[in-house]
Amino acid sequence: MPELPEVEVVRRGLEEHLVGRRFTDVQVCHPRAVRSGEPEVLVSSLRDATVTAVKRRGKFLWLDFGEDFLLQVHLGMSGQMLVAEPGQVQSPHVRIRAGLSDGRELCFVDQRTFGEWRLEKAVPDPWAAGAGVASPKNFLPQNVSHIAADPLEAVFDAQAAVARMKSKRAAVKTVLLNQEVVSGIGNIYADEALFLAGVRPRRSAALLSRPTLHRVLQSAAEVMECALEQGGTSFDSLYVNVNGASGYFSRSLNVYGRGGEPCKRCGAPIKRVVVGGRSTHYCATCQR
């Protein structure tokens, strides 16, 4: 499942190619791609709609048309949003094709069919209001309104996030994965952030000091910014940007997926454990 950096890479690519473009036609090629609604409604709503913005919160991605609805895009396990010349994308896994006013087309390719496009009501962003930056432009899908702001957003309130973390007695790794506490951090970047912060994943968030929790959040932001610079993390060909290129942050991972291998910092073997049902990696020497 793509995490924040991978979704942000896609968002930036879509923003470059879609903003100001109008959907001239939409073809649903597979019903599962619109399983949360009627394909006919999606097609009629998007036809002649002009993209005004491409936005994201955590792992959630959506297109804004300046209307009372938004197009939420779930990438799922293998979803790809590719912008190409008409007919250039010949994959048998194309689920939706949308013609653009500049003559190109947007293709939603999804091999495993866990992803989808869905129309959602646009509602004011409660997290933006709480951070004191509310504006008429701060709208998001109704079903995302409970998702906390992520560490790379302008509306992110680190002190409030630390307070939410401090109220949880669960392992700090588990708390980092709670999208209502802080969004966008998945299994990969939680492990990497905790390594950078020097904190063991099983420690109770409630028992960590506020400065330590701030350090964990700052480390998460640093790790994800670094991943963004490298195009995200690609372990297979299923995660690509809008041009079909893969990211290469996987080469920079310090602990995730490296169980039994030597720590790049101290040489001790990386430990693999299960925390909250999730495979977790850490260095017992570098993390306390």
Swiss-Prot record:
Q: Which InterPro entries match?
A: DNA_glyclase/AP_lyase_DNA-bd (IPR015886), DNA_glyclase_Znf_dom_DNA_BS (IPR015887), Formamido-pyr_DNA_Glyclase (IPR020629), FPG_cat (IPR012319), MutM-like_N-ter (IPR035937), Ribosomal_uS13-like_H2TH (IPR010979), Znf_DNA_glyclase/AP_lyase (IPR000214), Znf_FPG/IleRS (IPR010663)
List residues traversing the bilayer: none
Report which residue ranges the record marks as coiled coil: none
Where on this chain are zinc fingers (FPG-type) annotated? 254-288
Q: GO annotations under biological process? A: base-excision repair
Domain of life per record? Bacteria
Q: Where is the active site?
A: P2 (schiff-base intermediate with dna), E3 (proton donor), K59 (proton donor), R278 (proton donor)
- Subunit structure, briefly? Monomer.
Tell me which family the UniProt entry assigns to this protein. Belongs to the FPG family.
Q: Which HAMAP family match?
A: Fapy_DNA_glycosyl
User: Per its database record, what is this protein's job?
Assistant: Involved in base excision repair of DNA damaged by oxidation or by mutagenic agents. Acts as a DNA glycosylase that recognizes and removes damaged bases. Has a preference for oxidized purines, such as 7,8-dihydro-8-oxoguanine (8-oxoG). Has AP (apurinic/apyrimidinic) lyase activity and introduces nicks in the DNA strand. Cleaves the DNA backbone by beta-delta elimination to generate a single-strand break at the site of the removed base with both 3'- and 5'-phosphates.
> What is this protein's record name?
Formamidopyrimidine-DNA glycosylase
Instruction: Record the organism.
Output: Corynebacterium jeikeium (strain K411)
Q: What is the lineage of its organism?
A: Bacteria, Bacillati, Actinomycetota, Actinomycetes, Mycobacteriales
Q: Which gene encodes it?
A: mutM
